[in-house]
From Swiss-Prot:
The lineage of its organism: Eukaryota, Metazoa, Chordata, Craniata, Vertebrata. CDD domains: RERG_RasL11_like. The keyword Transport does not apply. This is Ras-like protein family member 11B. Belongs to the small GTPase superfamily. Ras family. It comes from Bos taurus (Bovine).
Length: 248
């Protein structure tokens, strides 16, 4: 079984800063759009992770990744957001460092948030995480891009090369959230990882006046006087005054 939901490829997407890219800030039906790139070494399960998030299914047979862009809708704090998830080809590491194509760099620049995936069965993919995080932040100078680190294949303990605690420590050092998942066995942690990113991006996208509005909305406003209530109180006061005069 194969899932191919190719919306467009990285190369076809509008360049950041262009008018076309600005038009893509809103998804279908005018919903706010959250763009997420999933990156990591080859064979760590990036495509399987994306498909799990999209369909809650594990599909073990995939065509070679051509940079597919997937979409779905997610409820975040009562608001329906349009989510675009960009799957990417595996990153290679050479003696001089990361080997990132311009297409991949463009994908990272395009994204509002990034999921960095490594496999607990591949120590080199774990070592790549720190370099990849640094590369992501360099492509977003002046702003700290939300990033989640995901350790995949948690079910393959018999061949693990990376203790999950190392992933947690690394993510903490990088200032990222961390999730250990088994894409083949569970979809809850996968969904939570994406949900955290969507929530963080959603908060960053709020207009400057919105946070204040949200804070003040938590404080009960004094109710405006109700005219019917005022009339009722006035009649009660008047009746009491009349009774007092009559008794005298």
């Amino acid at each position: 079984m194969r899932l191919i939901q190719n919306m467009c490829t990285i190369a076809e997407y509008p360049a950041p800063g262009s008018a076309a890219a600005a038009d893509c800030c809103l998804g279908a039906a005018g919903r706010r759009l959250v763009k997420i790139a999933v990156v990591g070494a080859s064979g760590v399960g990036k495509t399987a992770l994306v498909v799990r998030f999209l369909t809650k299914r594990f599909i073990g047979d995939y065509e070679r990744n051509a940079g597919n862009l997937y979409t779905r809708q997610v409820q975040i704090e009562g608001e329906t957001l349009a989510i675009q998830v960009q799957d990417t080809p595996g990153i290679q590491v050479h003696e001089n460092g990361l080997s990132c194509t311009e297409q991949l760099n463009r994908c990272i620049r395009w994204a509002d948030a990034v999921v960095i995936v490594f496999s607990i069965t591949d120590y080199k993919s774990y070592e790549l995480t720190s370099q990849l995080h640094q590369h992501v932040q360099q492509l977003h100078l002046g702003t700290r891009l939300p990033v989640v680190v995901v350790a995949n294949k948690a079910d393959l303990l018999h061949i693990k090369q990376v203790d999950p605690q190392l992933g947690l420590q690394l993510a903490s050092m990088l200032g990222c959230s961390f999730y250990e998942v088994s894409v083949s066995e569970n979809d809850n942690d996968v969904y939570n990882a994406f949900h955290v990113l969507c929530k963080e991006v959603s908060h960053k996208q709020q207009p400057s006046g919105t946070p204040e509005k949200r804070r003040t909305s938590l404080i009960p406003r004094p109710k405006s006087p109700n005219m019917q209530d005022l009339k009722r109180r006035f009649k009660q006061a008047l009746s009491a005054k009349v009774r007092t005069v009559t008794s005298v």
